[in-house]
UniProtKB/Swiss-Prot annotation:
GO terms for cellular component: Atg1/ULK1 kinase complex; autophagosome; cytosol; phagophore assembly site. Residues 936-951 have a biased composition (Gly residues). Residues 804-824 have a biased composition (Polar residues). GO terms for molecular function: protein kinase regulator activity. This is Autophagy-related protein 13. It comes from Aspergillus fumigatus (strain ATCC MYA-4609 / CBS 101355 / FGSC A1100 / Af293). InterPro entries: ATG13, Atg13_N, HORMA_dom_sf.
Length: 958
C-alpha cells in the first residue's frame, strides 16, 4: 500500500464525523493484533489536519488532537517488500501488534537464529572448522565456557549455538508528538522504505544465510537443523547465562562475532533502530565422535592446511635469490637454510651444525677457529658456518676441512655454455688476476682418459695470487674416471642459482662416459652411500652450508690476510697431496678393470650377432643353396633353411663348447673331416675316452671338438640337438639327385652316429688309399698277410678295374681328386643314418625320409648304384666304412655287449677293403644266381638285420 492521499475531506455534519472517528477508534482497539488494517477507511480523514467547519466546535477539537495523531501513528502498513506472511508467528508477535506509541510502548524485539543439537546421537559430534581446517568440538567448547549460573531462559537450550541475533527497538520519545503530523509522517515513511529494503538485502550476505543455503544444497546431516526464535528484549537482558553467541568455539585471533547497525530512523513515536550481531565463522558439520577423538590422539589435524605466510626475513631472503652470480646474503648458524636439508635411504643431511661430529673433526674445527685470523668487522658479530661444521661428518668431511679452512660456498652445477670447453681440458696452474671478473673463472678439471702429471702442491701454491691451497683446485688422478672435486671457491659462477646434480670437476655425464668407459663415479649410477662415492660426498652441493658473502667482502678479506699469498705450512700441503695420491690409486685400480671387461663384452657381443665376417670363427658352408649361400649357419638348421633371428649360434670364444669344430687330418695334402671357414687349419677331433687318437696338428688351433661317447643302442627317436649334430657336406651331384631341397624336417638336419676308434682309423686309411693307389696296395698286402679268416678278398687290380668300369674310381674321380686339394667340406662318409635303422647309412629304398636325409652321397657310389638291376635292398653303398661299422661294430657290440678289443681292431684291418667292395661283389653273385637272397651289410633297414649273415664264405669274428 501507498501513502495516504491528501484529498480534502467532504463536507459533512459534525456529529457524523465524530461518530465515524469513534467507530474507527473502537475498531482499532478491539482488533489490535490484526496483521494489517485497511487504509481505505482512513481516506476520509487526512493526516490530522481537518478543515474548519464550524467555529463553535474549534475549542472542542483542540482538546483532542493528540488522540487523532496517535491513531495515525498506530497504523500497520507495508513498505513495498514482497515477503510471505504467515500466521505461525501471530502469537509470538502479539505484544508488538497490540502496543501503543504512548501508553503501551513495545519492548525490544529479539530474533535469534541458532543450531539445534538435540538430534545428534551419542556417536555424533558437532564440530566447527577454523580458518586452518582444524576441527573443534562445539559442545565441548560450550561446556567449558559455562561457568556462570546455568539458568535457562524460556524457549532456549543450553546446547544451542546461536548464529545471529537481530534487535529491533523503538526508543522512548523525547517529547510529546506534535499535533501537526502531516509534514513528518511522509518523511518517516520514506526513510522506513530504505531501512527495510536494506534489511532484507543485507540478511542474505550474512554467514548464517550462506550456511543454510549450503546445507540445503548439499543435503547435509538431517540432525543439523537451523531454527529461529523471537524473544522479548526485557526478559533476554535479565538472563544470567553465558551468551552462546559471543562465546569462542576455538582458539584463534579472529573475531568471534561482528555487529552491524542499520542506523536510527527518527519518528514522532521515538527513535527506531535495527542492528544484527552474527558469528563470523559458521562452518559447522557433524562428524563421528570416534574419528574426532582418534584424530586428536594421532595428531592428524595438527598443523594441517595451515598456510604459512612468509615473514619479513623470509621475503628479504627470497628477494635476494635472483638468477645471477651475485652471492646471497650470509647464512649463519642461528639462521640456517631449512631448504638445504634433505634425506635419502643411506644418508641424511640436517640443517645447522653437525651435532654428531667426531672428536677429530671437532678438534680440527677448534684449531681452525683459533689459528684463523679475525674476520672483517662487518661479519665479526656472527661467525659463519665452516666446512667442518657444515659438511657431513666422516672421512670426506675431514679431508674437506683440512684442505679448506676458510668458509665454503655452495657449488654450482656443472654447466658448459660453450660447445667446446676452453679451459676444462687441463688443470689450471695460474689463477686469473684479481682485477678479472670472478664469474669468468672456469671450473678447473682434469680429463679422465689420459694421465696428467701435476706439479707438487707446494710449487703450484707458490704461484697463486689468491693464496688458496693447492687442494682447492681439482686434483685429478691419472687414469681416474672422475677426479675428486676440491672445495669450491668462496664465490660461485653465474649459474649458482641452478640446483642440479653436484659437479664432479666440471665433467658432464656424456664426457665422463666417453672417457672412462662408463665406469666413473658419476656415471656408474652408484648410490650415495656406496664406497665409490665416499670421497666426493663431503663436497657435494647439498651437503655444504657455505657462506654467501659479497665479492667486496671477499676482496677485503684478501687485503686483510696477506699471508694467503704464500703457503704457510708446506707439510700440510704435502699431506694433502699424499692423501690425494692414495685416492687416485684406488680409482686407478678400478680403471684397470676396464680393458678386460671391454674385451669380454666385445667378444660376447660378436657371438650374439649373426654377421658374416671373413675372420670370424663361426662356420660357413660353401655349397649351400643360393638363398643362404655363404651365410653363417647354425648347427640346428639345415643348409637350405633360411637363417632366422631365433636360430642358435656358435659363440666366437674359442672353447670346448664349439661342438662342431672338426679337425683336419691332412698334412698339406690329406683331407679328412671338415674345415672351419676361417682357413685351412682346424683342430684334432677327440673320439672316445680312449687315449689313442690320430692327431695331425695344424699350424694354429682355433677350436676343440667335443667328442661323443659311443653307445650300444642309439636312441631311435632323438630330438635335434645343436651340440650333437654334425655338419653335412653338400656336393655338386646332390642338387641333381635331390632337387628343390627335399629334406626331412621331422628330426634334426642330421645326427651324429656313434663311431668307434677303429672306425675312425679305417676311415682315415680308406681316404688315404683312395688318394694314393700305391699306399692302398701296400695296405692291402699288409692286411692280407695278417688276415687269417676264410673270406676271399678280391685283388686290388680287380677292384680297381671294376670301379673304373662303373666310372666311379674312388681315387681318380674329379670330385674326390679335387676335394683332396681344395674342397673344404669333405663328406664324413657313413655319418648319416636313416630313421629307425641301427645307425647304418642311408637307403634309397627307405622312402622319402632316407632320400631327403641322404645328403652327401659320393658320385662314384651313386653311379655304381645306378648300374644295378634295381634291387631295393642293394641301393645303399654309401661307403665301405659305413658297411664295416654296421657289420662289425654294431653287431658285435649288440651280440656280445662289449666293444671290440683294440687287438681285434688291429687284426680286422683287411675287412676294410673287403667290405668296401662287397656291394660290387654281390652284384656279380646276383647276376649269376638271379635272385640269391644273400645281401651286403650296407643294405636297407629291412635287410640289414635279416640278410646280413647270409653271405657265403663270411662270418664276423669267428
Amino acid at each position: 500500500m501507498h501513502q495516504h492521499p491528501r484529498s480534502p475531506a467532504p463536507a459533512a455534519p459534525t456529529s457524523s464525523t465524530r461518530s465515524n472517528r469513534s467507530t474507527d477508534h473502537r475498531e482499532l482497539d478491539t482488533d489490535p493484533s490484526s496483521p494489517s488494517s485497511d487504509v481505505r477507511m482512513h481516506n476520509g480523514r487526512g493526516l490530522g489536519i481537518e478543515p474548519e467547519t464550524e467555529p463553535s466546535e474549534q475549542v472542542q477539537r483542540n482538546t483532542q488532537p493528540a488522540k487523532e495523531a496517535m491513531a495515525k501513528l498506530n497504523q500497520i502498513i507495508t513498505f513495498n517488500v514482497e515477503i510471505e506472511d504467515t500466521d505461525i508467528l501471530r502469537e509470538q508477535l502479539r505484544i508488538w501488534r497490540t502496543c501503543d506509541a504512548i501508553e503501551n510502548r513495545p519492548p525490544p524485539l529479539i530474533i535469534e537464529t541458532y543450531l539445534e543439537t538435540k538430534g545428534l546421537t551419542n556417536n555424533q559430534s558437532l564440530v566447527i572448522l577454523d580458518e586452518n581446517g582444524k576441527r573443534w568440538d562445539v559442545l565441548e567448547a560450550l561446556t567449558a565456557s559455562g561457568q556462570a549460573s546455568p539458568v535457562r531462559p524460556p524457549h532456549s537450550n543450553s546446547d544451542d549455538v546461536i548464529l545471529e541475533r537481530w534487535r529491533v527497538e523503538l526508543g522512548s520519545a523525547s517529547s510529546k508528538p506534535p499535533s501537526d503530523l502531516g509534514s513528518i509522517l511522509p518523511t518517516v515513511y520514506k526513510k522506513s522504505i530504505v531501512l527495510f529494503r536494506s534489511l532484507f538485502t543485507y540478511s542474505k550476505f550474512l554467514p548464517a544465510w550462506k550456511f543454510a543455503k549450503r546445507n540445503g544444497r548439499l543435503r547435509s546431516n538431517p540432525a543439523l537443523q537451523i531454527r529461529y526464535r523471537i524473544l522479548d528484549g526485557r526478559t533476554a537482558s535479565d538472563r544470567r547465562q553465558v551468551d552462546h553467541l559471543t562465546v569462542p568455539l576455538y582458539e584463534g585471533n579472529t573475531k568471534v562475532v561482528e555487529t552491524y547497525s542499520f542506523g536510527v530512523t527518527d519518528s514522532p513515536a521515538g527513535p527506531f533502530s535495527v542492528e544484527v550481531t552474527y558469528r563470523t565463522n559458521c562452518d559447522f558439520r557433524v562428524d563421528d565422535s570416534e574419528a574426532l577423538l582418534s584424530s586428536r590422539f594421532m595428531g592428524a589435524d595438527d598443523e594441517i592446511f595451515r598456510p604459512s605466510f612468509p615473514s619479513r626475513d623470509a621475503n628479504r631472503r627470497a628477494s635476494n635469490a635472483e638468477p645471477g652470480s651475485a652471492p646471497l646474503e650470509k647464512r649463519t648458524v642461528e639462521e640456517p637454510d631449512p631448504g638445504r636439508a634433505y634425506g635419502s635411504l643411506s644418508t641424511f643431511h640436517h640443517v645447522g651444525p653437525a651435532t654428531g661430529a667426531s672428536p677429530i673433526s671437532a678438534l680440527r674445527a677448534a684449531r681452525e677457529s683459533v689459528t684463523s685470523s679475525p674476520s672483517p668487522p662487518s661479519s665479526a658479530s656472527r661467525r659463519p658456518l665452516s666446512a667442518a661444521r657444515a659438511a657431513p661428518t666422516g672421512r670426506a668431511a675431514a679431508l674437506a676441512a683440512e684442505a679448506s679452512p676458510s668458509p665454503l660456498r655452495r657449488p654450482s652445477i656443472s654447466f658448459q655454455p660453450f660447445k667446446a670447453p676452453p679451459l676444462s681440458a687441463s688443470p689450471s696452474l695460474i689463477d686469473p688476476p684479481l682485477g678479472a671478473s670472478p664469474r669468468s673463472r672456469p671450473i678447473v678439471s682434469a680429463p679422465s682418459s689420459e694421465p696428467k702429471h701435476m706439479p707438487p702442491p707446494s710449487v703450484a701454491a707458490s704461484g697463486r695470487k689468491t693464496g688458496q691451497a693447492a687442494s682447492e683446485n681439482a686434483i685429478a688422478s691419472s687414469n681416474s674416471a672422475s677426479p675428486r672435486p676440491a672445495p669450491i671457491a668462496r664465490y660461485s659462477s653465474a649459474f649458482s642459482h641452478r640446483r642440479g646434480r653436484p659437479s664432479s670437476g666440471g665433467i658432464n655425464k656424456i664426457e665422463d662416459d666417453a672417457s672412462s668407459g662408463k665406469a666413473s663415479a658419476t656415471s656408474s649410477g652408484a648410490q650415495p652411500g656406496s664406497g665409490l662415492l665416499a670421497e666426493v660426498t663431503g663436497t657435494s652441493a647439498d651437503s655444504l652450508h657455505a657462506d654467501d658473502e659479497n665479492i667486496s667482502e671477499f676482496l677485503k678479506m684478501l687485503d686483510l690476510r696477506k699471508d694467503l699469498l704464500s703457503p704457510s705450512n708446506l707439510s700440510n700441503l704435502d699431506a694433502v697431496a699424499r692423501r690425494t695420491t692414495v685416492t687416485s690409486a684406488a680409482l686407478t685400480r678400478f680403471q684397470r678393470m676396464r680393458d678386460s671387461n671391454a674385451a669380454l663384452s666385445e667378444s660376447m657381443s660378436s657371438s650374439l650377432l649373426l654377421q658374416r665376417s671373413s675372420n670370424a670363427s663361426s662356420k660357413q658352408l660353401s655349397g649351400v643353396p643360393p638363398m643362404v649361400a655363404g651365410a653363417s649357419v647354425s648347427t640346428a638348421s639345415s643348409p637350405g633353411k633360411p637363417i632366422s633371428p631365433h636360430t642358435p649360434h656358435t659363440p666366437a670364444i674359442p672353447s670346448r663348447l664349439s661342438s662342431n669344430s672338426i679337425v683336419d687330418y691332412n698334412d698339406h695334402g690329406h683331407s679328412d673331416g671338415r674345415l672351419l671357414h676361417g682357413g685351412p687349419t682346424s683342430l684334432p677331433e677327440d673320439t672316445t675316452g680312449e687315449e689313442t687318437a690320430l692327431v695331425h696338428r695344424p699350424p694354429t688351433v682355433t677350436a676343440i671338438d667335443i667328442p661323443t661317447s659311443p653307445r650300444l643302442f642309439p636312441p631311435t627317436y632323438r630330438r635335434s640337438s645343436s651340440a650333437a649334430q654334425n655338419r653335412r657336406s653338400v656336393v655338386a651331384d646332390e642338387e641333381e639327385i635331390f632337387p628343390f631341397n627335399m629334406r626331412s624336417v621331422s628330426l634334426g638336419a642330421e645326427e651324429r652316429t656313434n663311431v668307434s676308434l677303429s672306425t675312425l682309423h679305417r676311415r682315415h686309411e680308406y681316404h688315404n688309399a683312395a688318394t694314393n693307389p700305391e699306399q692302398q696296395q701296400e695296405s692291402q698286402r699288409a692286411s692280407s698277410s695278417s688276415d687269417q679268416g676264410p673270406t676271399a678278398l678280391p685283388s686290388p687290380a680287380k677292384r680297381e678295374t671294376r670301379s673304373q668300369g662303373d666310372a666311379t674310381v674312388s681315387g681318380q674321380t674329379p670330385e674326390l681328386s679335387s676335394s683332396a686339394n681344395h674342397n673344404l667340406y669333405q663328406p664324413r662318409l657313413g655319418q648319416f643314418r636313416s630313421r629307425g635303422s641301427f645307425g647304418g647309412a642311408h637307403s634309397l629304398s627307405s622312402g622319402s625320409s632316407s632320400l631327403a636325409r641322404g645328403g652327401g652321397i659320393p658320385t662314384y657310389l651313386t653311379e655304381r648304384d645306378n648300374d644295378r638291376d634295381g634291387n631295393a635292398s642293394g641301393s645303399n653303398s654309401g661307403n665301405s666304412t659305413t658297411e664295416e661299422r654296421r657289420g662289425f661294430g654294431r653287431r658285435v657290440s649288440a651280440g656280445r655287449n662289449y666293444p671290440p678289443h683294440p687287438s681285434q681292431v688291429e687284426e680286422d684291418e683287411p675287412l676294410l677293403f673287403a667290405m668296401s667292395d662287397f656291394g660290387a661283389s654281390r652284384r656279380s653273385f646276383e647276376e649269376g644266381r638271379q635272385g640269391n637272397h644273400g645281401a651286403d651289410f650296407g643294405g636297407s633297414r629291412r635287410g640289414s638285420g635279416r640278410r646280413g649273415a647270409g653271405v657265403p664264405g663270411f662270418h664276423v669274428w669267428s
